[in-house]
A protein has these predicted regions:
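Outer-membrane beta-barrel proteins
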Residues: 1-142
């Protein structure tokens, strides 16, 4: 194995059924994912792929790719960028969602201050819907 390299693989299966008023509805879900992460010095890079197939009253498939990179500027300051591209297919109709974020984190003693700027195109898999968010947070450890 290469120093700083990690790889994960996962699969899950959820089988559910419910009968209400004599009707039967199967809502099975199958999910597979894998990721690859590499850290060298002050830089960490990660990528992930996941696929979710769900059945029920309609066939739904989510196909997502994740990418992130972070850089530790110093022991106290780090910056990171993340991107998620996801496709939702319901009974043959596709919608692509794209999410980008950049964050900055500064730690001193037991206190961390973080700043995040994020934007999603086709947010919540709604074509033409754009959402953006900015946040500042402070965490204190005692």
């Amino acid at each position: 194995m290469v120093d700083g390299l990690s790889f994960n693989l996962g699969y899950s299966e959820l089988e559910t059924s419910s009968a209400e008023d004599g009707a039967s509805d199967n809502n099975d879900q199958h999910e597979g994912t894998f990721n690859l992460n590499y850290a060298i010095g002050a830089v960490s890079i990660g990528a992930q792929k996941s696929v979710v197939n769900a059945s029920g009253t309609s066939e739904t498939k989510y196909d997502s790719e994740y990418f992130g990179i972070s850089y530790a500027v110093s022991d106290n300051l780090s910056v990171s960028y993340n991107n998620i591209e996801s496709n939702k297919n319901v009974d043959g109709t596709d919608v692509d969602q794209d999410f980008d974020s950049i964050s900055l984190s500064y730690t001193v003693g037991g206190m961390t201050i973080g700043v995040l700027d994020a934007e999603a195109d086709n947010a919540s898999y709604s074509a033409g819907r754009t959402q953006s968010a900015r946040s500042v947070q402070m965490t204190v450890a005692f």
